[in-house]
Amino acid sequence: MNAFLVDGVRTPVGNFGGTLASIRTDDLAALTISELLKRNSGLDPALVGDVILGCANQAGEDNRNVARMASLLAGLPVSVPGETVNRLCASGLASAVNGSRMLALGDADVVIAGGVENMTRGPWVMSKASKAFGRDSSLYDTSFGWRFINPKLEAVYGVDGMGVTAENLVDKYSISRDDQDAFSFRSHMKATAARDAGRLAQEIVQVNIPRRKQDDLIFEHDEFIKPDTTVEILSKLRPAFRKEGGSVTAGNSSGLNDGSAALLLANESGLSSSGLTPLAQIISSAVVGVEPRIMGIGPVRASEIALKRAGITFDDLDVIELNEAFSAQALACIRAWGLDDDDSRINPNGGGISIGHPLGVTGSRILLAAARQLERTGGKYGLVTLCIGVGQGYAVVIKNTQ
């Protein structure tokens, strides 16, 4: 059997400390699951074979299997199980692939996949001392980056921060600051145009934020987009990760963001029994490992393998959703594929630099974005791909079924 993406919905992406900061991570995930079920009211919730959510943190309110907790909070029957997937930046894509495999095997006919991350609410964590009454405890902010580093791993592979890995790609592939800022500017302009034209709204469910002694705040647009930015403004920002000779800045990097997404997946049996119409077919996938110090190059080989498994080439693609962790990382991948920096197929409605990058959500967001873009344009094939911290790459090929 085959696996199909039927529908999907996401929250607007919130800034770090922004509009979604007051919402628990499990509640945020439940919100999009609940909306997905409302939008597909002909589906009996008891027929959902599994709820699979990506989440990269899992140290706070997203602990102890947030997918299961969100499923219950969304009102799904207790008989519907849940699983949380952690492949860092690609968690939301891995959840969809895991669900697709269940559908292909016939282990389920309908699956809800997706992802959640409230990076604002990532807690501090403290290690226990190595011995009773010891004083060698460590304290970490879990919102982003390494924690509890293994010295053996550090000795062999290093533990470069994500921004430093982007600087490593700048060095390796001779990517200029001007090109990075130009890429970032284009991302914001594309996202602004997509928002203003209502294309992003097709993916989004509004979030009502309770306020004391006031009406609820209605949150319905991604708040990380910067419509008024310019190349000149971006060029004035200081390097954020390498003070001397660096070129990766806050302006040409993705953000720390909050959000959730839910996707409805089904095989032919699930489509037929529930009267569902597929949006896209999941054709192939690939995941690879690369050197952790240049983790951003992971999409290159993963995409090449996924395309080969699908029996197509880059020339056959109508949309390419490449997560923009950093301008440098995206440009390194684009150039390695032999494509132009401004190829119109790449992130036509903006990407991680402009929309934001809530870690566990982005894979699901860009899978849905690619499917909706194919639906709008009548294109046939889409590629969805992300780099992953600690050196991996993930890619999925989809086919328009509309």
Name each model-derived stretch.
Residues I23, C55-V110, S143-G145, V156-M162, ...:
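Conserved catalytic cysteine-centered active-site region
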Residues A21-V111, G115-G134, I204-E220, R293, ...:
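Conserved beta-ketoacyl condensing-enzyme motif
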Residues V110-N168:
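Flexible glycine-/small-residue-enriched beta->alpha junction loops
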Residues R10, S22, D26-L31, G42, ...:
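N-terminal extracellular/periplasmic Venus flytrap/periplasmic-binding protein-like
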